[in-house]
C-alpha cells in the first residue's frame, strides 16, 4: 500500500514533507509495536524528531499508542503501532479536496477573461485589470490580454488524471 504514489504524497504532506517519516512507518509496519526510543535508536534519528513525526501520524489517526508507567522511575513509556486501515479513506478525502479545487479553478479559468503583466509575470482577472486601468499595480507596465487555453487544458489533464487514478485504484473502490 505504501508504494502507491498517491498514498506517498498524502503521507508526505501529513509528515510535513519529512522523508524520515517513511522510515518511521516502515519500522512500525515491520515491528508492529515499538517504542519511540527504539525507533530513534534503530534509525539513528533524534528522539524529538521521531516524536514529532509520530504525533503528526497520530493526529491523522494513522498510528495508535499505549502508555505504560514505570513504577520505579514514574516515567511513561509509549509503545506505538501502525493503524493504516484508515489510509485509503484519508487519501480519498484529500484527493476529493484536490479535485474540487482543480474543478473550481477550471470554472474560474473558463468563465473569465484574464490580463497579464509580462514584466512581473502576474495574471489578473478582467475586473482587476480594469480597476487598475490595465496597468500592472506592481510595476505600472501595460497589461496584455492573456490566452488561458493552455491553463484550461492543463487543468483538464490534471482533473482527468486524478479521476482516472481514483477510479482505477482498488484501494478507493469503497470511497
UniProtKB/Swiss-Prot annotation:
**Claim: Transferase is one of the keywords in the record:** no
The cross-references to InterPro entries, in alphabetical order and at most eight, read: TF_E_archaea, TFE, TFIIE/TFIIEa_HTH, TFIIE_asu, TFIIEa/SarR/Rpc3_HTH_dom, WH-like_DNA-bd_sf, WH_DNA-bd_sf
Which GO biological-process labels does this protein carry? regulation of DNA-templated transcription; transcription initiation at RNA polymerase II promoter
Q: List the coiled-coil residues.
A: none
Q: Does the keyword Iron-sulfur apply?
A: no
One Pfam family, please name it. Answer: TFIIE_alpha
Domain of life where this protein originates: Archaea
Sequence ranges assigned to domain HTH TFE/IIEalpha-type in this UniProt record: 3-88
Keyword terms, alphabetized: DNA-binding, Transcription, Transcription regulation
Q: Which SUPFAM superfamilies match?
A: Winged helix' DNA-binding domain
Q: GO molecular-function annotation terms?
A: DNA binding
PANTHER family xrefs:
GENERAL TRANSCRIPTION FACTOR IIE SUBUNIT 1 (PTHR13097:SF7), TRANSCRIPTION INITIATION FACTOR IIE, ALPHA SUBUNIT (PTHR13097)
Q: Which family does it belong to?
A: Belongs to the TFE family.
What does it do?
Transcription factor that plays a role in the activation of archaeal genes transcribed by RNA polymerase. Facilitates transcription initiation by enhancing TATA-box recognition by TATA-box-binding protein (Tbp), and transcription factor B (Tfb) and RNA polymerase recruitment. Not absolutely required for transcription in vitro, but particularly important in cases where Tbp or Tfb function is not optimal. It dynamically alters the nucleic acid-binding properties of RNA polymerases by stabilizing the initiation complex and destabilizing elongation complexes.
Domain notes from UniProt: The winged helix domain is involved in binding to DNA in the preinitiation complex.
Task: Describe its partners and assembly state.
Answer: Monomer. Interaction with RNA polymerase subunits RpoF and RpoE is necessary for Tfe stimulatory transcription activity. Able to interact with Tbp and RNA polymerase in the absence of DNA promoter. Interacts both with the preinitiation and elongation complexes.
What's the protein called, per UniProt?
Transcription factor E
Amino acid at each position: 500500500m505504501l508504494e502507491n504514489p498517491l498514498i506517498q504524497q498524502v503521507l508526505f504532506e501529513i509528515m510535513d514533507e519529512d522523508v524520515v517519516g517513511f522510515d518511521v512507518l516502515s519500522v512500525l509496519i515491520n515491528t508492529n509495536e515499538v517504542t519511540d526510543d527504539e525507533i530513534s535508536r534503530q534509525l539513528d534519528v533524534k528522539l524529538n524528531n521521531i516524536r514529532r513525526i509520530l504525533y503528526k501520524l497520530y493526529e491523522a489517526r494513522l498510528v495508535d499508542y499505549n502508555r505504560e508507567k514505570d513504577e520505579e522511575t514514574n516515567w511513561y513509556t509509549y509503545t506505538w503501532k501502525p493503524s493504516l486501515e484508515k489510509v485509503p479513506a484519508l487519501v480519498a478525502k484529500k484527493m476529493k479536496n484536490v479535485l474540487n479545487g482543480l474543478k473550481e479553478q477550471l470554472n474560474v479559468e473558463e468563465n473569465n477573461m484574464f490580463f497579464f503583466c509580462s514584466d512581473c509575470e502576474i495574471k489578473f482577472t478582467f475586473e482587476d485589470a480594469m480597476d487598475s486601468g490595465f496597468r500592472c499595480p506592481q510595476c505600472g507596465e501595460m497589461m496584455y490580454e492573456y490566452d488561458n487555453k493552455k491553463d484550461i487544458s492543463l487543468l483538464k489533464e490534471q482533473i482527468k488524471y486524478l479521476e482516472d487514478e481514483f477510479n482505477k485504484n482498488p484501494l478507493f473502490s469503497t470511497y
